[in-house]
């Protein structure tokens, strides 16, 4: 990736980092996201490789914060988690493969984390429907199994966990799997249904610094409401059952859903998964 796919921009040195952070903030971004870790050919260890130094991460965080902008990082190894928190990152995506030192640091700082396990869970549970190999399915299932206990531990310690959907990839197309992370939080991490719902609403709004607008049902907040036919405190999957979605309100206005659903078309090439050969919809997963 040379910075030409999607919205990413590759930077190579201090000057490029400063220039790019300033450019993005000038253009009005709400957050700066850093891909702290990544995959490399012939990789041997689990997780990903740290591709940013601590000094580089500190430069991004200090500069962005000086310009009033928070920073989030994609991190999938222990070193990356520790470096990101020490550099001042506001929020971490994934945070898998943590060691004890990283766990202690997360618990001490209460840095918000979004595991975003929906991608892995869909591939593990429904991968056969889209041509994923059994090897890949087991790899992603193992990532959830190996890290679920860690997330339960930090959740019990008061670390804010929030629900990320990974929506937009062929395995997690928009409009299909937004509820799925709540199911993973209940089934794998061991939360109650209400705790998972809180992670998707109140915790999420605080973590992305929007708690004065969304996340709770209070006077003065945006009236974004999902009314379902059933009790999600008894069955969390109701939130993903389109036949059970009674009413949807956005900013106080009901969203009309009497039109036929639009066909889900293939995403951009860079969002196609090398692990599958199709788009995973709920309908396909149930076959």
Regions found by a protein language model. Give the residues of each.
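Active-site core of metal-dependent hydrolases
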Residues: 36-149, 162, 167-169, 188-191, ...
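His/Asp/Glu-enriched, well-ordered alpha-helical/loop segment
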Residues: 66, 143-231
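Active-site microenvironment of metallo-dependent hydrolases
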Residues: 156, 201-287
């Amino acid at each position: 990736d040379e910075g030409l796919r999607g919205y990413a921009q590759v930077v190579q040195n201090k000057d490029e980092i400063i220039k790019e952070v300033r450019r993005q903030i000038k253009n009005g971004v709400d957050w700066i996201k850093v891909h702290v870790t990544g995959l490399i050919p012939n990789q041997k260890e689990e997780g990903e490789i740290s591709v940013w130094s601590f000094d580089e991460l500190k430069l991004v965080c200090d500069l962005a914060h000086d310009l009033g902008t928070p920073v989030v990082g994609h991190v999938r190894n222990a070193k990356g988690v520790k470096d990101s928190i020490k550099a001042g990152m506001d929020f971490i995506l994934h945070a898998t493969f943590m060691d004890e030192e990283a766990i202690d640091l997360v618990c001490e700082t209460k840095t918000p984390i979004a595991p975003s396990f929906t991608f892995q869970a869909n591939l593990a549970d429904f991968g056969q429907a889209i041509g994923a190999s059994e090897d890949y399915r087991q790899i992603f299932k193992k990532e959830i199994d190996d890290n679920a206990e860690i997330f339960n531990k930090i959740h019990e310690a008061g670390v804010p966990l929030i629900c990320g959907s990974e929506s937009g990839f062929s395995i997690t197309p928009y409009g299909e799997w937004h509820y799925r992370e709540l199911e993973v939080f209940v089934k794998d991490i061991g939360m109650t249904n209400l705790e998972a719902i809180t992670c998707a609403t109140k915790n999420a709004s605080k973590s992305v610094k929007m708690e004065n607008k969304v996340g709770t049902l209070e006077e003065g907040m945006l009236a974004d409401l999902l009314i379902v036919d059933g009790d999600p405190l008894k069955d969390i999957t109701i939130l993903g059952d389109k036949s059970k979605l009674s009413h949807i309100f956005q900013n106080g206005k009901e969203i009309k859903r009497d039109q036929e659903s639009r066909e889900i078309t293939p995403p951009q090439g860079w969002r196609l998964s090398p692990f599958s050969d199709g788009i995973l919809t709920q309908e396909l997963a149930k076959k």
